[in-house]
Amino acid sequence: RYLFVAIDRATRWVFMRTYRDQSERSSTDFLRRLKQAAPMKIKTILTDNGSQFTDRFTSKAKTPSGQHVFDLACLSLGIEHHLCPPRHPQTNGMVERFNGRISDIVNQTRFASAAELDDTLSQYLSTYNHLIPQRALKHQSPIQALKKWRSEKPELFVKRVDKQPGLDK
């Protein structure tokens, strides 16, 4: 199983899904589901240089062509696609840290099925977004931060924050 993760830099809100592979099809499906789930407008997305996101290292020019399936999906959704510099994972540090937390959970548990893994990840995601305060957010949870942002800058949002999966206070 492969985990795709998106984190809003301003509020630390997380969206994630597991897939059977790291294909272009999986990455574009993830992008479309992210766009549908996110309460805020998505202007820019930052990804690593995996072949599911870019042709940067498979094209002869060694630069992205802009014609990769993921680039075209971003374009169709009005999202600007940025790539991390090669061999510089700290650029995407929020996702790297979150993935470390997920690795800890996965490595401490034996799952009887993929469905059980998905259920555990879904429960953790809900807990993370709704209940875990973040120091960078002045000890608010990501959902609390989203609600604050929405009250101050409603033009950045496409739907109500309280329609998120999990607990709603």
What residue spans do the PLM features occupy?
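C-terminal domain-tail junction helix/linker
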Residues: L72, L77-I79, G100-K169
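Active-site beta-loop-alpha junctions of metal-dependent nucleic acid enzymes
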Residues: Y2, M16-T44
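A generic secondary-structure micro-motif detector
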Residues: D21, S59-A61, A114
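Short aromatic-enriched loop/helix-cap "lid" or pocket-rim segments at secondary-structure transitions
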Residues: F57-S59, V95-E96, W149-S151
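Helix-centered, glycine/charged polyanion-binding patches within enzymatic domains
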Residues: K60-T91, V95
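Hydrophobic (often cysteine-bearing) scaffold residues that line and stabilize catalytic clefts
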Residues: S23, S27, G66, T91, ...
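Mobile genetic element proteins and their domesticated derivatives, centered on retroelements
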Residues: A6, R12, F30-L31, I45-D48, ...
